[in-house]
Structures are given as C-alpha cells and as structure tokens.
C-alpha cells in the first residue's frame, strides 16, 4: 500500500479496496521501522491518526465521498496543530503546544486527510539542507549520506521514502521546490496569497507561502484544491477564485510558449543537470510546446537582495520569542535583559542567530537605505523582468538547483555556498509568482529537477505541463532502493 500515490489511494478508498485505518496502520508501521534512518519526523501522532482514520471510514460508510477523505498526509512542523507540539525544529519551541490549527491544517482535515505527524525541517525554515534542526539532520533516502534539501527536507524525505504519500511544506526561497528536486518529487510553491499563511509560523512574511510536496503533479493538484482559497484571517491572502486544478491537468500542450532564461544556463550549473533540462525541453516540444530564449537581467542581483530582505523580516518576526510569553526560558535570569539575551542565545541555533543579526544590521538606521531599501528596489526590477517575460511566453523553464544533493556537513562551514543552491528558486518568491519543480532525471544516481514558473495565479498551467510531462516520462515513478 505504501507504493500508492495520493490519487491511487483516493480511487482505492472509493472502491473500498482498503480502509483508511488499514492504510494508516501500514504507514505508521513503516515510519516506526524506517524513519530512524532518515529522521524525517519530529512527532508521530499515531493515536490521533487512527482516530481520524476511523472517523474518515465512518464518513465513507455513511455515504460521504471526497478525494482526500481518509488519505494520510503529514505536516511540516511550522504549521500549528492544535494539541500537538509545533516546534519549528527549534529548541526555543521544543515544548510549544499550539492552541489552534493553521488554516492549511484545518482545510486538509476538513477534506478528510489523516495526519500522521509533524515533519523535520531547517530551524525556523532557514536553510537549504535540513541540517540546522534542533532534532538532528534529515537524511536523503536516495543516499543517506546526502542532504534532502531544505527547509522542507523532512517533508521531502518522508514522501520520497514512501512513509507518507504527500506532505505540506513552506517555500520562502525555494524550500518546497529545492528538496522536491533533490528527492525526485513534485513540489509546488503557489502564488503569494493563494494559500493562507494563518497559523504558519513566519520566517519572512512577504516571501513565505505554503504548498504541497507529492509524487506527481496529479497529487499536488489534489492537495492544492483543498489548501487554496481566500482566508479572512490572513490579510495577505487574495480573494481570487480557485481553479479546477484536476480538470486542467488534461489540457493538451499544443501552442504552449516556453521561455528559457539565458541567465539560468551560465557558470555554476552542473553541465549534466543542464543536459537533463534540455532533454525535458525536447520532450515538451514533442508534446506541442514551442521554445525561445529570454532574458531575466535582474536575476544576477537576486541572492544579495533576498539575503537582505528575508533576514530583515526574520529579525522582526522572531523578536516575539523572548522567553516571556511562550517557548524556551533560560534558568535563573538576573534581569529582564539577561532573560532576553540568554533565552534567545540558548534557544536559537547558529544559522537562525546569523540571520537575525544580518537582518537587524540591514534595518539599522545607518544602513537601512544602503541595504534594505536597495534590496526592495531590486525586488521590483525582478518582478518587472517576469512581467515582461510573460508577455512573450506562457511559462519559464530551467533547472531547479545548480547541483544534485551534496553530502551532509559539506557546506556547513560555508553558509554562502549553501545560499547559492537557491539561485534559481528565490526569484519566484521575490516576485510572488508560482513555481513548480518536477523530476527530470538522475546525475550519479541522485535525482535532479526541472523548475517551471508561471504568471500570477496560473498554478493550473504549471500542474498541467508537469502532468503531461509525467504522462510521457517515468522519472517521477522511480523510488529509492530499499524504500
């Protein structure tokens, strides 16, 4: 049963080939057996999951139907889950039990999803390797000596290892798409404002967006159908009609105009990965697409701009973790200042502290104009580049990452080397457009992904192209050995 995709599970449950309880029990046994070697889960909610599965089976028996009714999933551990620890993979929130469900959690539960637990990640979603977690690094099931990507690495590893058919993630600079690429999954970052951020613990509020990781575009469409939509509790959530993502999957690609940005194929890209991207392009041409080269000139400034804006917002967002209201509190503080200093100093990990300091510096009076204001101007230029490009093409295609997965600890001493792994993904967050990564082959036995970018609220187009490509290829069906 663990080999079934979300869509196959939906069909199996509807045909009464198995029950949600049977499926959940099988996956929980698999998590207990295999996850110690991967460390993808922080919290497994076995009792709650079986309770939800029994309720889903009862709803089906009473005549209710629904594609996700009784389907198992798991949540990245920055989505608040009522009565269950929500840690953000940080010592500072190690004992935080959320008093409410995030909107994403609430909507998937209403659709009948069974949550098997909370997934490991980079601390406060800051990282590209899932190595900075207070609970230890996550391992990539394709090679357990390698990272699974980040920050949604636990989500990616758990789905790739068939511990759970699909998972939620969040994407601030590539944190859904990059781990999806490194673990042979399909990962979607929706348009900023398409999915509610209410109850999703913030890293950088103008960049964060929740989305699905799954084994196919069809599975992502199923999840996004339940997750998307206006939420009055989130002031950044856009009141825009939700497309029929499942119906859109089957559109032919004849006449689709694809743009290849010349800036994506320069120095720093593994040439074997470039070959995989071009093979994908040839496949899409066979399906009726046309391809042309385009320019995104401001992309060269994206990483410096992102690493000013994101830490600046993080320094503000993370100021709430002060040892007073909730979360970790140091022992025997000598004064209020000592309480703040020691609670934060002992509670946050090295990468989080690094980004808080960078962000505070960028926002300080003497440097605000030189750094933060300039970064926001670059952000506007990047957005203008995309708006211009989408007047010429329907979709932009390129590599998701410059390299396949690297070894655990390899980039630990060089934060900038890790930051450069996000070079192709962060522009979508800065512009707010949707992006999807899909499996496109292997380099040295490790998966690589192709990224698709579309205009605002065109998630259905991304899912359509990915689904048609997945009908013509079988990369996405390949599983890591032993899983």
UniProtKB/Swiss-Prot annotation:
Q: Which UniProt key words apply to this protein?
A: ATP-binding, Ligase, Nucleotide-binding, Protein biosynthesis
- The answer to whether the entry has keyword Protein biosynthesis is yes
Positions of the catalytic residues: 76 (charge relay system), 151 (charge relay system), 175 (acyl-ester intermediate)
Molecular-function GO terms, alphabetical: ATP binding; glutaminyl-tRNA synthase (glutamine-hydrolyzing) activity
Keyword Ubl conjugation in annotation: no
Q: Which residues cross the membrane?
A: none
Question: From the record, what ranges are coiled-coil?
Answer: none
Question: What are its E.C. numbers?
Answer: 6.3.5.7
Q: Which reaction does it catalyse?
A: L-glutamyl-tRNA(Gln) + L-glutamine + ATP + H2O = L-glutaminyl-tRNA(Gln) + L-glutamate + ADP + phosphate + H(+)
Enzyme class at the top of the EC tree: ligase
Name its GO BP terms in alphabetical order.
translation
Q: Which GO terms describe its cellular component?
A: glutamyl-tRNA(Gln) amidotransferase complex
* Matches recorded under Pfam families: Amidase
Which top-rank group of organisms is this from? Bacteria
Q: What role does this protein play?
A: Allows the formation of correctly charged Gln-tRNA(Gln) through the transamidation of misacylated Glu-tRNA(Gln) in organisms which lack glutaminyl-tRNA synthetase. The reaction takes place in the presence of glutamine and ATP through an activated gamma-phospho-Glu-tRNA(Gln).
PANTHER family xref list: GLUTAMYL-TRNA(GLN) AMIDOTRANSFERASE SUBUNIT A, TRANSAMIDASE
HAMAP family on file: GatA (MF_00120)
| Family the UniProt entry places it in | Belongs to the amidase family. GatA subfamily.
Q: How does it assemble?
A: Heterotrimer of A, B and C subunits.
Report the protein name in the record.
Glutamyl-tRNA(Gln) amidotransferase subunit A
Q: What is the species listed in this Swiss-Prot or TrEMBL entry?
A: Azotobacter vinelandii (strain DJ / ATCC BAA-1303)
Taxonomic lineage: Bacteria, Pseudomonadati, Pseudomonadota, Gammaproteobacteria, Pseudomonadales
């Amino acid at each position: 049963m663990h080999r079934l995709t979300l869509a196959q599970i939906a069909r199996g449950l509807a045909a009464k080939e198995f029950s949600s309880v049977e499926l959940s029990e099988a996956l929980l046994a698999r998590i207990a057996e295999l996850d110690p070697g991967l460390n993808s889960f922080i919290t497994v909610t076995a009792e709650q999951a079986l309770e939800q599965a029994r309720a889903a089976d009862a709803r089906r028996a009473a005549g209710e139907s629904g594609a996700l009714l009784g389907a198992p999933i798991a949540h990245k551990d920055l989505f608040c889950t009522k009565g269950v620890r929500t840690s953000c993979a940080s010592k500072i929130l190690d004992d935080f039990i959320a008093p409410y469900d995030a909107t994403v959690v609430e909507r998937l539960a209403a659709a009948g999803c069974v949550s098997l637990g909370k997934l490991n990640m980079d601390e406060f979603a800051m990282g590209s390797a899932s190595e900075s977690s207070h609970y230890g690094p996550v391992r990539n099931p394709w090679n357990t000596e390698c990272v699974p990507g980040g920050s949604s690495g636990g989500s990616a590893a758990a789905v790739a290892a068939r511990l759970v058919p699909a998972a939620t993630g969040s994407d601030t600079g590539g944190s859904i798409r990059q781990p999806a690429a490194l673990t042979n999954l399909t990962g979607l970052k929706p348009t900023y404002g398409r999915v509610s951020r209410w109850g999703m613990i913030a890293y950088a509020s103008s960049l964060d967006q929740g989305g699905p990781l799954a084994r196919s575009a069809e599975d992502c469409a199923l999840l996004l159908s339940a997750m998307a939509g206006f939420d009055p509790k989130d002031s950044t959530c856009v009141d825009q009609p939700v497309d029929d993502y499942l119906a859109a999957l089957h559109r032919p690609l004849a006449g689709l105009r694809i743009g290849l940005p010349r800036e994506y194929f320069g120095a720093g890209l593994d040439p074997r990965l470039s070959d995989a991207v071009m093979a994908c392009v040839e496949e899409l041409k066979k399906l009726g697409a046309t391809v042309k080269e385009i320019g995104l000139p401001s992309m060269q400034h994206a990483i410096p701009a992102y690493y000013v804006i994101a830490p600046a917002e993080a320094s503000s967002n993370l100021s709430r973790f002060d040892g007073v209201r909730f979360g970790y509190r140091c022992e025997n503080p000598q004064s209020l200042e000592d309480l703040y200093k020691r609670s934060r100093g002992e509670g946050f990990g090295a990468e989080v502290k690094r980004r808080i300091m960078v962000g505070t510096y960028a926002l300080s009076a003497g440097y605000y104009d030189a750094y933060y204001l300039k970064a926001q101007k670059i952000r506007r230029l990047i957005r203008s580049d995309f708006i211009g490009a989408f007047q010429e093409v329907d979709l932009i295609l390129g590599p998701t990452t410059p390299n396949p997965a690297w070894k655990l600890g390899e980039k630990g001493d060089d934060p900038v080397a890790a930051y450069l792994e996000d070079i192709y993904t962060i522009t979508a967050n800065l512009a707010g457009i949707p992006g999807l990564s899909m499996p496109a082959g292997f380099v040295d036995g490790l998966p690589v992904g192709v990224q698709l970018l579309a205009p605002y609220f065109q998630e259905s187009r991304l899912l359509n192209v990915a689904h048609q490509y997945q009908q013509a290829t079988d990369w996405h069906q390949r599983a890591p050995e032993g899983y």
